[in-house]
Amino acid sequence: MNLGDPDFVDVSKVISDMLSTNFAQGLKKKINDNKTFDPNYYGGRWDQINDHGTSHLSIIDSERNVVSLTSTINSYFGALMLSPSTGIVLNNEMDDFSIPMKSSSNLTVPPPAPANFIRPGKRPLSSMTPTIVLKDGKVKASVGASGGLYIIAGTTEVFLNYFFLKMDPLSSVLAPRIYHQLIPNIVSYEN
């Protein structure tokens, strides 16, 4: 997908596709119960950045005030720098930008995504997905996750467990998870 900072990259087509029933039905038709294909079969063109060092918290108080907060230093010990005035470890979120490189002869790894190349003032893509769910203007849930590339799938699975499988909040979070991102072409099972 050609996702990037919308102040620098036109993401209207990607967003339109992500919200399109026809696009989703087209992807669904490509799913084969017996085989996973290369990423380009599903429309994947670019490599994904793997990040670490993330925490998430979700809070809803007795008055229905809500917070969904994801924080990251990205890699272990972030930028390896500590602020002398605050003692806070600084993040290295700059590592989430795609880095231009020469063409690779390795056909199993897609090239970096140009929409996520670094530019002054630009924000890198991130898998952080702090989410507040509302219905008719009222808070129904607060959800998010940590785990780098597992964040989006984890957040989605907790959401589905709670709203569609009718699990309680703790069971929704503790339930085993399945993860597949096409590269590497391996299914991960977490329990």
Curated annotation (Swiss-Prot):
Disruption of the gene: reported phenotype: Mutant plants (Ds insertion) display reduced inflorescence height, silique number and seed yield.
Tissues expressing the protein: Expressed at low levels in embryo, roots and leaves. In mature plants, expression is restricted to vascular tissues of roots, leaves, flowers and siliques.
Entries under SUPFAM superfamilies matching the protein: N-terminal nucleophile aminohydrolases (Ntn hydrolases)
Amino acids binding L-glutamate: T72, N74, E93, D96, S126, S127, G147, G148
Any one GO MF annotation of this record: glutathione hydrolase activity
Disulfide bridge map: none
InterPro entries from the UniProt entry: GGT_lsub_C (IPR043138), GGT_peptidase (IPR000101), GGT_ssub (IPR043137), Ntn_hydrolases_N (IPR029055)
Active-site annotation: T54 (nucleophile)
Domain of life where this protein originates: Eukaryota
Biological process annotations from GO: glutathione catabolic process
Entries under Pfam families matching the protein: G_glu_transpept (PF01019)
Family, per entry: Belongs to the gamma-glutamyltransferase family.
Database matches in PANTHER family: GAMMA GLUTAMYL TRANSPEPTIDASE, GLUTATHIONE HYDROLASE 1-RELATED
Name used for this protein in its record: Putative inactive glutathione hydrolase 4
Organism field: Arabidopsis thaliana
Biological classification of the source: Eukaryota, Viridiplantae, Streptophyta, Embryophyta, Tracheophyta
Gene transcribed to yield this protein: GGT4
